[in-house]
């Protein structure tokens, strides 16, 4: 059996923090931010929690998939900014979506959270352990952002995304390529009750080297040329 995405959903807060407004909080301007990051605005969760955003995205994904919450037998939540140490975010999602038959666990993998969750869902489905998995990624990065640190505050915002992955005989998620470099863990950190601290140059160097390598590995696994990729 294959793991196939059958529905997606997302949620972004209403409040928009533009580059112009951000320039009143820290020494920067719209041109500086856009030329370096391509970012012109970010969404901020003024009221509500990480789980609130997650539930909104989850309900949209269930509706898009055309299934009931009771059909879900596993919920994987990916977040690095949970509201509680416990209960975990996935259990709160279960409660507020009515997914009473689901096993729940969380993943903390920062930017890689969705890929890690999708990889886990794929493995569980292909092993025959679960048939319908709800993946929800939700982050409230504004809560751990130093709004006086120009190197980080321009980058992050809040929001949530979700998808439903189902066991199917049809073509599904083809390949996953995962790696970890714990030796570089100190270049991007957020200690408990502290804000994000980032060595931007080291993060950039790692990303521009390793992401293309991973993409090429996946293309080789599937005997596919880069020119064949549509999006």
Provide a role label for each language-model segment.
Residues 1-47, 149-209, 213-217:
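Condensing-enzyme catalytic core mediating Claisen C-C bond formation in acyl metabolism
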Residues 126-157:
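Flexible, glycine-rich active-site loops centered on histidine and acidic residues
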Residues 34-36, 40-52, 80-133:
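Conserved catalytic cysteine-centered active-site region
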Residues 5-7, 48-105, 224-231:
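Conserved beta-ketoacyl condensing-enzyme motif
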Residues 54-61, 117-121, 214-215:
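Buried hydrophobic packing segments
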Residues 33, 70-78, 105-108, 131-138, ...:
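Beta-strand segments within the central parallel beta-sheet cores of soluble alpha/beta enzyme folds
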Residues 11, 78-83, 109-114, 137-142, ...:
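Acidic, glycine-rich active-site loops and adjacent beta-strand->loop/helix elements
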